[in-house]
């Protein structure tokens, strides 16, 4: 589960309350175990999460050919149809693969080539709202391939009016409130409210409301074949 730096312990507490197991904090992320129903629940209820990724494959690659071959072996047809849409996000950390965009392109090529060989047709690329968003994390030779169950970042709650200048990130606001140890029975005052993000997030917290209940674009998992 991805989050902002400094909010890992806060997110771990939320995950524990939501029933997740085997919780372990990392850097800008918290790892846990849950079932598919839990994935749905976490996307809806977590206030300090940015994305919820489901790892499906780990492997090692020394070069672009090995990377392509390993990606092509993944049974992508389980996760998206040949008539669907995909997007690939990648993070590169290390000396072997230095460009995340290149990893994303090789992954995309492997996915569409697998579909062509199996079905003679391929998914199209859709950057904003794909049926399947693929996340690839690289550290030196090691790769972790995950499915992004959130779709778009979970800070996009759905209540903000477009056009506000320098708005406060909703996940950051929710984390600030929890770190402040605010007593929910006391009044909450924001004298420099701007777009009102702190007040809205405080309202969600005080009334124990699911912060992502009103997301306009929904969640990535809602476009998966098994949903």
Which residues does each predicted region cover?
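Non-catalytic nucleic-acid substrate-recognition regions in nucleic-acid-modifying enzymes
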Residues: 1-130
